Amino acid sequence: MIFGYVTQSDKVEKRISITPEIVKKLNKENIQVLINKDYGKNSNISDQHFVDAGAQVESVEKIYSSSDVVVQICFEDPETAKLLKKNCYLIVNHFNKNNKELESSLKSKNINIFSLDLLPRITRAQSMDILSSQANLAGYKAVIDSVYEYNKAIPMMMTAAGTVTPAKFFIIGTGVAGLQAIATAKRLGGVVSATDVRAASKEQVESLGAKFVFVESAENLETEGGYAKEASEDFKKKQEELIKQTIKNQDIIICTALIPGKKAPRIITEEMVLSMKPGSVICDLAALQGGNSAFSEPDKIIEKNNIKIIGYSNFASRISESASNLLAKNIYNFLELIYDKESKSIKIDMEDEIIKNTYVGESN
C-alpha cells in the first residue's frame, strides 16, 4: 500500500503527521511512504532525513492521485479533493462536516474519512488521543508565551536590593491544557490558582500545588466522557461574580475552557479585563472558538488599558517539533488498528468502538 502525507498550506499550521522514526516502522510493514517537498521544514526535519528513513519525496498532485491512504492535519479544499484516488482513505485531525462542497467532492470519489478528534475517551484509545497530546503542549506553550509578554519576573526573589514578589497565575479550565498550564506555572515559581465547572477536578488541581477556586453547586457539569458541559444561567452568574473578585488580583490568566461542539463560553467580560492591574496578561486558548475573554482575537495580541490579550489559534503548532513527534505517534497507533498486516490492506471493523467513533464515512 501507499501512504501519502501532505503539509498544510496555511501559515498557522506548522505541525506534520509523520516523522522519520514512523517512516521506518511503516516501511518494515511493506508500506510505501510519500511526502511532499519540505514536508518537515517547520519541525526541523529535512527531506533528506525522510529519504534516509525510506520515504519518497513527490509532488502534492502525485501523492493525492496515487496514495491508498492520505494523512493530513486538515483537509478543506473541494478542488483538492478531486485529485484524490477513488476509494482511498483520508485520515485527518478534524473533518468539517459543515463544508458541503467538500462533502460533495469527496462523496463523488467514494472517499472513506476518519476524523481523529472523535476518538472515544477509553483506555485503549489513549495512545491515539491527538486531543490530549496536543492540548498538553498547548497548555505548556500558553504559559511560556504569556511569560514572554509579561514584563516582570515570575518567581519570588530575595536580594540585597529588596524582594521580588512572585507572579500570580489564574488558570480557567482544568482539562489537559489547564493542568499542564498549572504544572508549568508552578515550575516557573508562580503562585497558581485555578477554576473549573467540574467539581471532580479539585483533587487534580490541588495535587499540582494550586488553589482550587470553585462555585459550590448541586449541578453535575461533567459529561460521561469527562468533558465540561454547559452550565445553567444561575451557575453562570455565580461563576461570573467569583471570577470577577478573583481576577483583579492576578498577573497572568490562562483561559482553556471549551465545550465540545459549541462556541467557547465567554468567562472574562470587558469590565473584568479593565479591572486588572496594568501589565497583566490574558492568554486565551479558546480565541478561535469565540474566546473565553473579551477583546481576544484569533492570532493577534490585543492591548487594552495596558493589559495584553493573547489569542493565538494554535499553540501546539507554535511548538511544532514536539507536537509533531507526539502527533505522528498518535496517528501511527491508529493506523496500526486499521491496517491488516496479513492482507496488507485497510480493514474497517465497525464493531470496534474506536473505528465506529472516528469513521465519518463516505464523506457523510
Where are these regions (language model features)?
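Rossmann-fold NAD(P)-binding glycine/threonine-rich loop
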Residues: 97-123, 262-316
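Glycine/threonine-rich flexible loop motifs
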Residues: 12-17, 79-83, 258-268, 293-294
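Adenosine-phosphate binding glycine-rich loop
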Residues: 117-118, 123-160, 166, 293-364
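Glycine-rich phosphate/diphosphate-binding loop of Rossmann-like nucleotide-binding domains
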Residues: 7-45, 153-246
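Glycine/serine-rich phosphate-binding loop and adjoining beta1-alpha1 elements at the start
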Residues: 2, 8, 76-168
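A structured beta-alpha segment of the ubiquitous adenosine-cofactor-binding alpha/beta core
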Residues: 54-68, 76, 223-253, 257-274, ...
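An N-terminal-biased, well-structured beta-alpha scaffold segment characteristic
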Residues: 1-109
